[in-house]
Amino acid sequence: MSLGRLGLVQAGQPSKQCPTCPTLAEMTADATATAADIMAGKTAYVRGEKLTGTLVPITKIDVAEEGIKFSYSTFEEVPEVFDFSNVTDLSYIFDTCKSLISLPSNLNWGKMTNVVAAFRGTKSLNDEVNIEPLDVPSLEGIFQRSNISKILNLSVQSAYTAFNAFESSKLTEIGNIDLPDIVTATYAFSNIPIVHFPKINIPKIANCSFIFYNNQSMQSLAYWDFSNVTVATNMFKGCSALSSIGDIIFLHTALSLADSPNIDEDTLRRFGGFANAAGESGVAPLKSLGLPAAALTFNTAAQTYLETEGIIAKLTDENWTVNFANSM
């Protein structure tokens, strides 16, 4: 008897991105069994067929061997009967488990090869993120729309994208984030309630469009390295409370802060300082370095200060177009 689809997967709309998840056609409407039921030999579901009678008690179920995905399950904690020691593919494994409050204790992050959307939609998850080492190609949607509020440590090698990684999560506190190979992070930290976003290591980032989109509570960004950034469309769209960017590293592409009327003078002055090479603090002198012209857009509240301090003149001399608007 295959245990690949035990009734611990609740009947419901499976993830359309998860080809291995059971479909409604494969499950009866009440296809929900508990680990206690299984251990007591009461009821189980295999490929949607209800089995009753006495089952041989199971001490452990190998999640990897049985190919089990728990998407849409309703339990708060993963029953101990499930053994995760051989799991390498976490993709979609707890997708939309809305009642799950904690992660399995025996996850071996060093063995994982796929974590796409692993904990997406876990709206009750109370655990702190403490993940290292992790070597995967993508962090796409790993904690998207989850209840995660704190990252202690997130250290990931090889990952190219962090698309939607923490989008619409409850993230308010970030410790160490080391993402040395991430190139695109669209919406990665968008629509979160964080107030102060610390310095993170993400040196190869090229596309940070919408990365902080709609972070209405975010007041400060400690540091951002633009050395390799080629696209920053709507990076700060909806960041109405943003007042400070602690360090701007080699900005040389178009950027808008039109949605941020409270940018402080220290931050505005940083746009008047030039950086002649990647890794240096300041804005690139585009003309002097032979780089393409680009535009900077500020909220109209900053116009008087930038004019008075001569920052607009400095920027336009170096092929920057300076615009002002009340919103993006």
Question: Which residues make up each language-model segment?
Answer:
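Negatively charged
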Residues: 2-5, 10-328
